[in-house]
């Protein structure tokens, strides 16, 4: 992290001058920021993120934060002796697990982030997709092919959901009124069943419904990498699909990029995958000429 005391007044003025047109570009716009569990890191990292979110609100940007919590959920499940398994990149969530997931996401991480933002001078409101029926979900389905019979089989993921509908009534009461929504990726079914939703998918659905100017996915990697492990600074949807097809984009990056494509199709102007462990990653992306991470656009 740069020590500001070593930056000359002239350099500080240059940095502020460079930021001005970007601030004007995002004036009164909504930015959805997905803050991944792996990106949270130490307490000071989370507090620095919170200060940056407050800065966005102070510059007339409307930030909406969606947080994950995979590592924290895993830690709690292990502590309670509950075995956790994954399939197709998603945590299989049985009745016992969904209680822990809800407790960690909505009761612990969410309130911690709200506290950090409020401590930094903001007015954060902690919610999850269940509040006000904000996000309605259906049971997620995935399939696998049996290696011997070659027969396609359905994977039972338990209480894992995929967003079906986003009701903006509650969010619209907060956005633009100096309040910062902080959302845990939990949703409810039409019959009231709680679902655990992948945080990237949840953020993409919310950003799409809001027609956000930007969706930022903060993760633990620099962005999308080519086959030489070098950062790809910019991709069109067409290029992204090609890189998925040829295997350049693989593993856990595939669902992230698919979320980006979905959000763009729903009206989000641009989506950026960035390393949340980089100090002030959000500010670097929004307020500097070079940005950071990988920008995906139509």
UniProtKB/Swiss-Prot annotation:
Transmembrane segments: none annotated. InterPro entries: AceGlu_kinase-like_sf (IPR036393), AcgluKinase_fam (IPR004662), ArgB (IPR037528), Asp/Glu/Uridylate_kinase (IPR001048), NAGK-C (IPR041727). Keywords: Amino-acid biosynthesis, Arginine biosynthesis, ATP-binding, Cytoplasm, Kinase, Nucleotide-binding, Transferase. CDD domains: AAK_NAGK-C. Belongs to the acetylglutamate kinase family. ArgB subfamily. Catalyzes the ATP-dependent phosphorylation of N-acetyl-L-glutamate. PANTHER family: N-ACETYLGLUTAMATE SYNTHASE (PTHR23342), N-ACETYLGLUTAMATE SYNTHASE, MITOCHONDRIAL (PTHR23342:SF0). This is Acetylglutamate kinase. It comes from Rhodopseudomonas palustris (strain BisA53).
């Amino acid at each position: 992290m740069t020590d500001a005391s070593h930056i000359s007044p002239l350099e500080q003025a240059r940095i502020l001058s460079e930021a001005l047109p970007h601030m004007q570009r995002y004036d009164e716009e909504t930015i959805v920021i997905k803050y991944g569990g792996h990106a949270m890191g130490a307490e000071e990292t989370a507090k620095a993120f919170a200060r940056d979110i407050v800065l966005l609100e102070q510059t007339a940007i409307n930030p909406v934060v969606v947080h994950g919590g995979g590592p924290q959920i895993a830690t709690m499940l292990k502590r309670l002796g509950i075995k956790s398994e994954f399939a197709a990149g998603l945590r299989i969530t049985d009745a016992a697990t969904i209680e822990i997931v809800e407790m960690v996401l909505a009761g612990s991480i969410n309130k911690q982030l709200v506290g950090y933002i409020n401590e930094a001078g903001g007015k954060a409101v902690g919610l999850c997709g269940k509040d006000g029926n904000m996000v309605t979900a259906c049971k997620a389905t995935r399939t696998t092919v049996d290696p011997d019979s070659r027969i396609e089989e359905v994977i039972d993921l338990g209480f894992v959901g995929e967003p079906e509908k986003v009701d903006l009534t509650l969010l619209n009461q907060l956005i633009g009124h100096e309040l910062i929504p902080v959302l845990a990726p939990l949703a409810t079914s039409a019959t009231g069943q709680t679902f655990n939703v992948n945080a990237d998918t949840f953020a993409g659905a919310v950003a799409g419904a809001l027609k956000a100017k930007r969706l930022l996915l903060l993760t633990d990697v620099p962005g999308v990498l080519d086959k030489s492990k070098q950062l790809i600074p910019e991709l069109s949807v067409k290029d992204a699909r090609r890189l998925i097809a040829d295997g350049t984009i693989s593993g856990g990056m595939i669902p992230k990029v698919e979320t980006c494509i979905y959000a763009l199709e729903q009206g989000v102007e641009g989506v950026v995958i960035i390393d949340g462990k980089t100090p002030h990653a959000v500010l670097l992306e929004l307020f500097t000429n070079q940005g950071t991470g990988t920008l995906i656009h139509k």
